[in-house]
């Protein structure tokens, strides 16, 4: 059956994605992506693959649409005509299948995803949204796509139930019941050690206590954020059982390199702001050694003996003086605002709190483009006042409510005035206005600042 072109379904392109595409096209986004990914594609062998520019746009959609899986991204691309326009799909072209997106992600290496993240930082630096002087650092846990019941012993390869059964039989219980296994498990110490247990399909996932108190296999995502603008300048994914003072080394090195790349005329990284988890003697000494001032909250460790470590004493005391000053207090307050916001946008509304991929490299590829989309949202907010498509929808709803309130205003006023002037029961009385009667504006209206 033939269908005329004018009879095919059409939709007005989403204004947010239209403006975003204009920004990407003006900076040769597709040409840059194709040049980076050329070595991963054969010239004339096999089926045509997913275009690099289209692939990276699909990953950007994960943040803008709040989609946590590649399957969900593919479904959304198939469902929306405006997103098809953003992806550059013609009417006769079908959107890529989720397996095509996954295969392309595995094909393109991590360094290329890092380069695309840096490309976005260049666009922010051109707009003055990357200063690079003061960096805040913080981390969060991402729930792994792996179940605790599937972990195995590192030495023997036994599953958890097989290991408990062997312990029960060694203690004299030949056929242990579930209650016996549970009792033996409760009495054991160090039952959740990452030194003894691993997941066979995701060795990078570590047994970790989540922020809500649950114990789960997880990964650790760490951000470095420009505290002057809120731009994410570096993202790393590391072992969830590593301490903050250990993982911060890789993140700060990555942040310093990216700042030097995108702001070559600047002074580079000068200040680091962190919470109590990043406070240690060696961490403060290392920061001073490279000429970086620290503003790190200090936990209460009581009286300390500095006789054998005067260098650490000086670093700790200088950090303490800085955080007690006016600038230090201001930076620590700013850290709570500028650092927590990306975590909320990326992992709560961005739906990446639980990952569907396995392995640090695969997860980091998604998180890098997720953070890149957040940075593009900052640029869009500077240019048009909104940072996500949903923000535009909220403004449209507020505007419609204001219009509806204005339409209803005459009826509302008439009803109020009618209640003020009420006929007297006596025929000789005239209409009177009682002193205690007031205009009643209790009718629900939608006067908001969204007007």
What are these regions (language model features)?
Residues 10-60, 65:
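Basic, short loop/linker segments at the boundary and entry of helix-turn-helix/winged-helix-like folds
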Residues 39-43, 55-62, 232-238, 268, ...:
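Glycine- and acidic
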Residues 51, 75-78, 87-292, 297-299, ...:
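Polybasic low-complexity intrinsically disordered regions
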Residues 239-245, 329-427, 434-436, 445-451:
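Basic, amphipathic alpha-helical segments enriched in Lys/Arg and hydrophobic/aromatic residues
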């Amino acid at each position: 059956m033939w269908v005329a072109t004018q009879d095919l379904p059409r939709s007005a392109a989403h204004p947010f994605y239209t403006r975003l595409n204009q920004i990407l096209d003006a900076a040769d986004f597709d040409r840059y992506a194709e040049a980076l990914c050329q070595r991963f594609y054969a010239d004339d062998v096999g089926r045509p693959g997913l275009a690099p520019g289209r692939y990276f746009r699909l990953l950007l959609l994960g943040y803008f649409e709040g989609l946590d899986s590649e399957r969900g991204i593919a479904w959304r691309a198939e469902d929306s005509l405006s997103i098809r326009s953003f992806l550059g799909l013609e009417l006769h072209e079908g959107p890529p299948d989720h397996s095509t997106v996954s295969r392309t992600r595995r094909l393109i290496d991590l360094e290329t995803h890092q380069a695309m993240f840096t490309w976005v930082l260049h666009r922010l630096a051109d707009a003055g949204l990357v200063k690079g002087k003061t960096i805040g650092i913080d981390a969060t846990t991402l729930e792994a796509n792996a179940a605790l019941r599937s972990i195995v012993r590192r030495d023997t390869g036994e599953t958890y139930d097989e290991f408990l059964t062997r312990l029960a039989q060694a203690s004299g219980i030949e056929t242990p019941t579930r209650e016996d296994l549970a009792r033996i498990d409760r009495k054991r110490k160090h039952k959740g050690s990452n030194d003894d247990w691993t997941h066979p399909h995701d060795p990078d996932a570590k047994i970790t206590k989540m922020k809500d108190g649950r114990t789960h296999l997880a990964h650790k995502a760490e951000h470095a954020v420009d505290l002057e603008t809120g731009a994410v300048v570096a993202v790393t994914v590391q072992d969830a059982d590593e301490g903050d003072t250990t993982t911060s080394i890789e993140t700060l090195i990555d942040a310093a390199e990216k700042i030097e790349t995108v702001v070559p005329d600047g002074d580079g990284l000068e200040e680091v702001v962190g919470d109590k988890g990043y406070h240690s003697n060696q961490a403060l000494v290392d920061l001073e050694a490279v000429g970086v001032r620290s503003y790190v909250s200090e936990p209460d460790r009581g009286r300390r003996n500095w006789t054998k470590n005067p260098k650490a004493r000086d670093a700790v005391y200088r950090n303490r003086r800085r955080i007690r000053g006016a600038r230090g207090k201001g930076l620590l307050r700013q850290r709570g605002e500028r650092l927590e916001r990306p975590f909320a946008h990326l992992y709560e509304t961005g739906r990446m709190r639980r990952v569907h991929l396995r392995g640090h490299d695969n997860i980091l590829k998604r998180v890098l483009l997720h953070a890149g989309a957040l940075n593009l949202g900052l640029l869009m907010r500077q240019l048009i006042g909104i940072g996500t498509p949903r923000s535009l929808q909220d403004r449209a709803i507020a505007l419609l409510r204001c219009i509806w309130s204005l339409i209803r205003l005459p009826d509302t006023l008439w009803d109020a005035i009618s209640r003020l002037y009420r006929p007297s029961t006596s025929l000789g009385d005239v209409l009177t206005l009682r002193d205690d009667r007031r205009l009643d504006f209790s009718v629900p209206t939608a006067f908001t600042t969204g007007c």
